[in-house]
Regions:
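Short hydrophobic alpha-helical segments enriched in small aliphatic residues
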Residues: 5-7, 12, 16, 24-25
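Fe-S-dependent hydro-lyases/dehydratases of central metabolism
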Residues: 34-905
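Cationic, low-complexity basic patches in intrinsically disordered or flexible, solvent-exposed regions
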Residues: 20-22, 898
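Basic polycationic patches enriched in arginine
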Residues: 10, 18, 31-33
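Methionine residue identity
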Residues: 1-3
């Protein structure tokens, strides 16, 4: 049999079996590792037991516990409860002595998914079942070990705006029609896989449901109390960090790893304390605070860090406010953004209808286990930052980055607001074509939503109206929002201004803003108008919100309503006149509600029974239907949504030589996963649109790129399909980089659309590399940003820096991340795209490798690069060809061991 270069024997379409890495010894694949017995003791006042992490820490270093931050305490408990006993002391020492000399395991309690990455993860597991069956294994044995909760929230596009009284029903009907293939597959998964719970479409956003109901904060399982921890297939999973729950956003590949019972191996992260001082000024929302914090924390370079917010300012914030801050952790680059458990936590659990018994357990455990905020007074951090809440003014962020904060008072000085003219009913320069109250970032904060409702009421009383070209919408992350708005009498006020409920889903925040009115779209095209979107979301990257919104601004929900009235971003929102009432000029200050009224309405209108009314039936619909399913999915050959994945066969099962690689693209700083694999609407003239038309889909049912990620033939055509891409290999006659989804095929030097270039290289079996600047792969945690480049034939990416989740996804797909050393960039190397590249050296965690660059002149340049396989586990996954190949190898190895007869003497 032919040998793979890393010592694996090829067998059929799978790499044959490989000896497991030493740190996995004793881990039984696809089974939960049992809890330990040491340091287990009764939890006072309950009939439960808990693991005394403090005693374990003090056994290593007396007095160390009081200085440990919240993050370290939760991870210490996880180790004491779940780590291999033989490894416990060594792993725990990393935390106690704040070392980063070795990896330690983390066993999250849950996996939470939205339907896009959750679906692709389950497509991978269904494909893994096929691969296992092809090799004679039992496909029914492939099941998630860790509980998986999948919430369908990413599929709905706002085709009908909030001014249509039937918008919700119409949008849901369109969602069901477009996604029948996907929902059929998800329904099969619910029955065919064990340990998978599905919340169907139309019920809310995963993070808000997680915050309001799914997270218990403290689990009580088999007589043991322990902290809730989780990974989620979305970068905004830290939303629930507001409750003191360590929740980390991961890609679908890493989530699959956790689903199947594997530890998530890590090194001690940087833990940064952020002391919040002061109190916010009157009229300032949590949105204003988080946008100011995002700017501040980006400047402080907290990428990859775990943040712990504390101090008097933190204590004054409600869980709704804290969740707004925690939600945007990926925007300021942090892995987690935690608030310790305190009275605010208990108040929120009461407000959201948790049981008295659960609330009592949270308080008892937190106080006994050292997770109560008061027990952290002596905690020591690697860095201490301070932020004054009283310094925050009314803010927006834009036009294309969440950390690009601009005070509304400075809009004119920044050149955003300025002179504009309106000719009758035609759209002005800078027209706001989308105004969306959207996203769990803000709609899980009752204060923000109620502020928008009160501003709408005040505007209605003064005769102000939405401009006719503004597509307005309200898409809360939970049905409870509609209940408390109705209770407060504010739902009708929002509807009057065009902000009726269009969905309980992600919608515009995820780029699912839907089609514009055809006449408005045509006017934009004919007049080449500069148009914008204003939304209460968390991201505004170029091209994300809508193809015809050239720029987008993030703002609080009440500001979104105000901009729907103003109608243009050129409007000075603080000073210009919104309208006249009885001859009086009306400005923003005249309709902005007072803090006292917002708080009074929130206190009177948001009630525990609303949450119970919504969630008790939602979580009661998962009883076993009694229908048995085949363990193998019956793939639909004509589907453009769900297709058997190719990761165990063909080119992807072949070797990666890391030799003779040509650059597919040379890219600037801040390349996002939206550049790598966009999620918004598919246009007819795109490669994916042409493919879908060829497959017989009408253009109105193309749906979004995101919804087709279960079919690799459609999804791979999204690779670098963002029209805002700048590939520095493609320049015009004056040497200026051209914008667009373009590539230059070498050695011919022919410029063509990116997909055609990828097809050309695939047909040639040409290995590829990508060269990039700093912060490569920031943004959403979409695994297709890695899958797409791997399917294209990319074997390595050399960049000045990587965002955490995307780097992990690249490794999970068998793509080698390489980081230039400080001072080395694509510019200092004078690359023009005609070069070929080799990677030389032994791949080990953090090793220095050599990038050989061969130029057309015959010259060779040798460049040291850092191997960004950061742990032994990552090396193991990479060498296996990726996490999916590793699953199959290890499953068959375990299956083979179980079938081997034991010799008795």
């Amino acid at each position: 049999m032919p040998m793979h270069p890393h010592g694996q024997v090829r067998h059929g379409t799978l790499f044959a079996l490989r000896e497991l890495q030493p740190h996995n010894a004793g881990l039984c694949l696809f089974r939960a590792r049992p809890m330990n017995t040491s340091y287990r003791q009764p939890l006072p006042g309950t009939d439960l037991q808990f693991f005394n992490a403090q005693a374990a820490v003090e056994a290593i270093r007396p007095g160390a516990w009081s200085r440990l931050p919240y993050t370290s305490r939760v991870h210490a408990e996880n180790l004491v409860r779940r780590c291999e006993p033989a490894l416990l002391t060594e792993c725990l020492t990393q935390i106690v002595e704040r070392k980063r000399e070795r990896d330690f395991p983390w066993f999250p309690a849950r996996v939470v998914c939205h339907d896009i990455l959750g679906q692709t993860a389950l497509v991978d597991l269904a494909g893994l079942r096929d691969a296992i069956a092809d090799q004679g294994g039992d496909p029914a044995a492939v099941n998630p070990v860790v509980p998986v909760q999948l919430i369908v929230d990413h599929s709905l596009a706002v085709e009908c705006g909030g001014y249509d009284p039937q918008a919700f029903e119409k949008n849901r009907a369109i969602e069901d029609r477009r996604n029948e293939d996907r929902f059929h597959f998800i329904d099969w998964c619910k029955r065919a896989f064990k340990n998978v719970e599905v919340i169907p479409p139309g019920n809310g956003i995963m993070h808000q449901i997680n915050l309001e109901r799914m997270s218990p904060v403290i689990h009580a399982d088999n007589g043991i109390a322990y902290p809730d921890t989780l990974v989620g297939t979305d970068s905004h999973t830290p939303h629930v960090d507001a409750l003191g729950v360590i929740a980390v956003g991961v890609g679908g590949l890493e989530a699959e790893n956790v689903m199947l019972g594997r530890a998530s191996w890590m090194r001690l992260p940087e833990i940064v304390g952020v002391r919040l001082t002061g109190r916010r000024q009157s009229g300032i929302t949590a949105t204003d605070i988080v946008l100011a914090l995002t700017e501040f924390l980006r400047q402080q370079r907290v990428v990859g860090a775990y943040l712990e917010f504390h101090g008097e300012g933190a204590r004054s914030l409600t869980i709704g406010d804290r969740a707004t801050i925690s939600n945007m952790a990926p925007e300021y680059g942090a892995t987690a953004a935690l608030f310790a458990i305190d009275e605010q936590t208990l108040d929120y659990l009461r407000l959201t209808g948790r049981t008295p018994e659960q609330i009592a357990l949270v308080e008892t455990y937190a106080r006994e286990a050292g997770l109560w905020a008061d027990a952290l007074q002596a905690a020591e951090y690697e860095r201490d930052l301070e932020f004054d809440l009283s310094s925050v003014v009314r803010n927006m962020a834009g036009p294309s980055n969440p950390h690009a904060r601009v005070a509304t008072a400075d809009l004119a000085a920044k050149g955003i607001a300025g002179a504009w003219t309106q000719d009758g009913s035609s759209m002005p320069d800078g027209a706001v074509i989308i105004a969306a109250i959207t996203s769990c970032t803000n709609t899980s904060n009752p204060r923000n939503v109620i502020a928008a409702g009160l501003l709408a009421r005040n505007a209605n009383r003064l005769g102000l109206v939405r401009k006719p070209w503004v597509k307005s919408s309200l898409a809360p992350g939970s049905k409870t929002v509609a209940l408390y708005l109705e209770e407060a009498g504010l739902q009708s006020e929002l509807e009057q201004l065009g902000f009726g409920v269009v969905a309980f889903a992600c919608t515009t925040c995820n780029g699912m803003s839907g089609a514009l009115d055809p006449a408005i779209q045509q006017e934009i095209i004919d007049r080449d108008l500069y148009t914008t979107a204003v939304l209460s979301g968390n991201r505004n990257f170029d091209g994300r919100i809508h193809p015809y919104a050239k720029q987008a601004f993030l703002a609080s929900p009440p500001l979104v309503v105000a901009y729907a009235i103003a109608g243009t971003i050129r409007f000075d929102i603080e000073n210009d006149v919104l309208g006249l009432y009885e001859g009086r000029e009306i400005r923003l200050k005249d309709i902005w509600p007072s803090d006292e009224e917002i708080d009074a309405v929130a206190n009177a209108s948001v009630k525990p029974e609303q949450f119970r009314t919504v969630y008790e039936p939602m979580f009661a619909i998962h009883a076993d239907s009694g229908i048995s399913e085949s363990p193998l999915y019956d793939w639909r050959p004509q589907s453009t949504y769900i297709r058997r994945p190719p990761y165990w066969e063909g080119a992807l099962a072949g070797e990666r030589t890391l030799r003779g690689m040509r650059p597919l693209a040379i890219l600037p700083d801040n390349i996002t996963t939206d550049h790598l694999s966009p999620s918004n609407a598919i246009m007819l003239n795109s490669a994916a649109g042409e493919y879908l038309a060829k497959m017989g889909l009408p253009e109105e049912d193309f749906n979004s790129y995101a919804t087709h990620r279960g079919d690799h033939l459609t999804a791979q055509r999204a690779t670098f399909a963002n029209p805002k891409l700048f590939n520095e290999m493609v320049v015009d006659g004056e040497g200026k980089v051209r914008q667009g989804s373009l590539a230059r095929v070498e050695p011919e030097g022919q410029v063509m659309r990116m997909w055609e270039a990828i097809e050309t290289y695939m047909n040639r079996k040409q290995p590829l590399i990508i060269i990039a600047g700093a912060d490569y792969g920031q943004g959403s945690s979409r695994d297709w940003a890695a899958k797409g480049v791997r399917l294209a034939g990319v074997e390595a990416i050399a960049a000045e820096g990587f965002e955490r989740i995307h780097r992990t996804n690249l490794i999970g797909m068998g793509v080698l991340p390489l980081e230039f050393l400080p001072g080395t960039t694509r510019h200092t190397l004078h690359l023009d795209g005609t070069e070929t590249f080799d990677v030389v050296g032994q791949r080990q965690p953090g090793a220095q490798l050599t990038l050989h660059i061969y130029r057309t002149t015959g010259a060779r340049t040798e460049v040291p690069v850092l191997c960004r396989l950061d742990t032994a586990e990552e090396v193991s996954i990479y060498e296996a060809g990726g996490v999916l190949q590793r699953f199959a190898q290890d499953f068959l190895a375990e299956n083979s061991k179980q079938k081997t007869p034991v010799a008795h003497t």
